[in-house]
């Protein structure tokens, strides 16, 4: 393998991470198809196959001879221990192919084809097993043997799966650039995104391009699989460079844009489209699990994440980013459809508990410095509610509200109402009164935390906030955004609030919490906020996508997630009266 070729290096890394079942054995038939072979059966676990995981018939590109390839699939490196001595060892599998499959299972139409036994693995043939391999082949001169290790398969994948028939020159160039630049923690995979847009037929504005409008469903399915493969190569490559946050970002973007493409033509309920989307979903879960494993130990240590930055403002930004990531991972489990991904769904409490531990050990997470961090805060609160940790939600929302009130009264260290970290630094270092006024003209946090406190029964924290907002900092504009019925058209492609929805501005904060609850109840009675009723993701059992999109694109979490808090169903199915009341006190979670 060319060590200077980042594509092949990435492919080789990627292949070495695949499981034998459901991953490597799904890739090989697709590869063989592109090579001009016809896989005769699909690999099946639990079915006795007499050594052959799957056969494939075709014509050799080397000498033009018709041949029947008999694949024996293994995982990892082949050494002396995995060569022989176990019923599932390589030698025993090959002998079963010779003794049974070749003797009685060759289809009649292929009896004259040349027979080639191919041992395919995600690793290498170790030096200690190479003499055994050579000796075995010498003792069976009537047969041909080939070993396809990770390097060999990566060469074939690049040649046949990532070739000019699937990726044109520009796509291949963009994929290579994404691999080279992917280890940069600030890189946002512009090159990979351009590849995805071209493959999926999406224009820069999120609508169908001319090419996309011409795509048939079979063509789209192939494009989705190609995009998935390109994303996997990038994700695994940068994961190997210890950039798991970047690897997770790639899988988030691929999942969301693939689903957006399906929604553009209302194809998401087609079974064949769903199957491909769920394959990408499973890849997202794997990336999410790897990211969680990387940070889990740090969040349980007092200020365990402080080693990644020194500046106070930067530390707050880092912490709230981790809050949003852990919360979206937790919601991917908590809101998973029963009967699907049950093992992952069972981990929802684990993720919520880890997030609660992080908040205890990192008190600065209750001091947001950017108004957009309200998104991460809301995702965390929704996770706590969905997993039954109501008291954690109450305590943390009240603490954030108290600190928010304090910094606005102080006139320093308040969350800036822009997305610019430079504005935050400017404010802290030498912000003028005029600049301070500009950066706190509007606040999502005021309305959001005030309404969270009211619905969670944190009346004291709310009423203190409302009083001081009215008297000490009335210049701060409180506002709240609500999606409108057309929200799915952009939700999975970009930040939805810039081109759709409606904003309550100013958002009134009455003196008493009960007055705000009464106002929320009146709002609920209109039925305007049941945004999930229009969710194409919820309709097919993939509601977590809506919340992953909130964090990824920085779209505010819809207020209905806490406006209907007294009877919010786990999957948005049950109806309620629309009456907002503070929840009853329950024991500590």
Segments predicted by a language model, with ranges:
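Mixed-charge (Asp/Glu-Lys/Arg
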Residues: 1-589
């Amino acid at each position: 393998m060319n060590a200077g070729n980042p594509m092949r290096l990435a492919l080789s890394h990627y292949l070495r991470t695949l499981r034998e079942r459901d991953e490597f054995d799904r890739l090989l038939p697709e590869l063989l198809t592109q090579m001009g072979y016809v896989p005769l059966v699909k690999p099946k676990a639990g079915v006795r196959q007499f050594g052959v995981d799957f056969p494939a018939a075709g014509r050799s590109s080397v000498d033009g001879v018709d041949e029947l390839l008999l694949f024996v699939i293994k995982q990892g490196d082949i050494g002396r221990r995995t060569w022989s001595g176990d019923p599932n060892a390589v030698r025993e599998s090959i002998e079963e192919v010779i003794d049974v499959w070749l003797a009685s299972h060759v289809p009649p139409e292929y009896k004259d084809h040349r027979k080639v036994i191919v041992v395919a693995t995600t690793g290498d043939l170790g030096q200690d097993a190479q003499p055994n391999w050579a000796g075995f082949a010498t003792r069976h001169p009537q047969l041909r043997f080939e070993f396809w290790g990770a390097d060999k398969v990566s060469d074939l994948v690049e040649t046949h799966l990532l070739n000019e028939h699937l990726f044109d020159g520009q796509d291949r160039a963009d994929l290579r650039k994404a691999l080279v630049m992917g280890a940069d923690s600030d890189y946002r995979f512009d090159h990979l995104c351009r590849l995805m847009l071209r493959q999926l037929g999406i224009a820069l504005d999120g609508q169908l391009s001319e090419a996309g409008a011409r795509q048939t469903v079979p063509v789209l399915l192939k494009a989705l699989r190609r995009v998935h493969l390109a994303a996997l190569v990038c994700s695994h490559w940068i994961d190997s460079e210890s950039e798991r946050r970047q690897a997770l970002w790639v899988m988030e973007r691929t999942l969301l844009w693939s689903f957006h493409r399906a929604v553009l033509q209302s194809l998401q309920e087609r079974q064949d489209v769903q199957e491909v989307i769920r394959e990408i979903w499973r890849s997202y879960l794997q990336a999410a699990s790897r990211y969680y494993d990387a940070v889990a130990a740090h969040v349980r240590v007092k200020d365990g994440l402080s080693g990644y930055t020194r500046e106070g403002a930067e530390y707050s930004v880092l912490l709230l980013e981790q809050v949003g990531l852990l919360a979206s991972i937790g919601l991917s489990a908590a809101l998973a459809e029963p009967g699907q991904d049950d093992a992952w769904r069972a981990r929802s409490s684990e993720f919520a508990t880890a997030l609660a531990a992080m908040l205890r050990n990192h008190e600065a997470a209750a001091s947001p410095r950017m108004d957009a961090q309200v998104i991460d805060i809301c995702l965390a609160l929704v996770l706590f509610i969905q997993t039954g940790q109501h008291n954690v939600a109450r305590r943390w929302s009240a603490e954030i509200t108290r600190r928010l009130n304090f910094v606005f009264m102080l006139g320093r260290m308040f969350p800036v109402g822009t997305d610019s970290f430079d504005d935050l630094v400017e404010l802290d270092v030498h912000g003028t009164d005029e600049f301070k006024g500009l950066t706190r003209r509007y606040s999502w946090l005021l309305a959001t935390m005030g309404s969270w406190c009211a619905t969670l029964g944190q009346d004291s924290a709310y009423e203190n906030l409302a009083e001081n907002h009215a008297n000490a900092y009335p210049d701060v504009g409180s506002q709240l955004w609500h999606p409108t019925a057309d929200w799915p058209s952009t939700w999975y492609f970009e930040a939805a609030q810039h081109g759709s929805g409606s904003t309550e501005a100013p958002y009134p904060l009455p003196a008493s919490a009960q007055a705000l609850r009464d106002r929320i109840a009146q709002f609920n009675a209109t039925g305007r906020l049941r945004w999930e009723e229009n969710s194409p993701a919820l309709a097919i059992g993939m509601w977590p996508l809506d919340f992953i999109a909130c964090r990824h694109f920085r779209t505010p979490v819809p207020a209905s997630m806490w406006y209907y808090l007294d009877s919010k169903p786990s999957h948005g199915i049950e109806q309620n009266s629309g009456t907002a009341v503070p929840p009853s006190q329950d024991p500590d979670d």
